[in-house]
Amino acid sequence: MKTAYLLAAFAPLVGAVLAGFFGRRIGRAGAHTVTILGVGVSLVASLITFADVMAGNTFNGTLYAWSVIGDIRLEIGFLVDTLTATMMCVVTFVSLMVHVYTIGYMEDDDGYQRFFSYISLFTFSMMMLVMSNNFLQLFFGWEAVGLVSYLLIGFWYTRPTAIFANMKAFLVNRVGDFGFALGIGLVLAHFGTMDYAKAFEVAPTLAERTIQIIPGTDWSLMTVTCICLFIGAMGKSAQFPLHVWLPDSMEGPTPISALIHAATMVTAGIFMVARMSPLFEMSDTALGFVITIGAITALFMGFLGIIQNDIKRVVAYSTLSQLGYMTVALGASAYSVAIFHLMTHAFFKALLFLAAGSVIIGMHHDQDIRNMGGLRKYMPITWITSLIGSLALIGTPFFSGFYSKESIIEAVKYAQVPGAGFAYFAVMAGVFVTAFYSFRMYFLVFHGKERWMQAGHGHDAHAGHDDHDTHDDGHHHGLGPNDRPHESRLVI
């Protein structure tokens, strides 16, 4: 099975290198062929791994030792269990769909090969993060995901808004990563190892240990370590108050919005807390902190979604709210439920983002939902996909979101940690808020009067915001007086 693990992790990297360094030589078709092939191989290897794990086999081993410093070993290794196998399948499947979608979405872009190289590199970084068996490799995967997201958010680097957005994402995540690095430093200093298994084995003996952050005051080592690690998750998974970078990340092309928000960067923090669950279970204070932050994010980001008029920003704030739900589940010690919602959310949120991209193309790059209406008649396939995604998002019975959200609400109801009462109120209220902003967007876009006839122009259609998911090259944005919305190409 080691071959399958290596293929799953490194096949996207091979595609990224070929498309990045030899993109001009192999051309557009060559670039998307090698990257899609790489991610496809990774998906097949991930499915084989998942089947093997379901058969009861797990793996925890070292591939390569970088260095040995005293008793501390710095290694590259894989830990493959149920959590890892699930994340591998989610990441590779959504990434493959985004790669295929990109063929149509970016067909006229000058940076076509560069974009395919970036999204494959993004997939590789996330695979190394989820498959790691030690804190050092986790940190490198963590930072690699952040670096590539910086490159992707600022993909159209000639636009000042894109440069501002990627710098904002980079700097806000540095705040979270500082806490994350402190947490790893505490693990190294007090646990004496970077290996997950050894750290979890030592943890019970350190449950009562205290440290002095401020002279004369004792703080629980486990609480401080867990909160520092969670601050890292607050940055990556865009939890309040470190959520501010994520709406601006809409400056990147729509395919990467789907990849960042559905399967990769923003789920890294949720995955990390679930992986560190043996440590978090030793501190009720840390769990109370997690559940409170998650509850605030779940409710108030939903409120912000109600007042957005940019179609991608509505879906972005929806992502923030749903990440809050996952964090609440983590705080309630329902780790499997959090990962379940992560998995279902990855699929329906990617669907919603890709449908939003289809709407943007059909509307000639107008993103303001106030200028839409009645698109169901012109974009029937996009309409039905948006409806399916919206029904799953609000938790309609028999759709995937219903089962995962229901599980979260039930877990919070019986949680005993501090802040559980507020969290229960927040997730219950959030159900109604989610339904409101989801169907506000759905009805404004696909039903009602055809308002683009009233707009009758391109640039003014963007009044009130400057989120244009297209190049800053001066071509026509929005529908002209003689234009009509149209369905996207089949590949999209």
Q: What does each model-identified segment do?
A:
Residues 1-492:
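...captures the hydrophobic TM-helix bundle architecture rather than a specific catalytic motif
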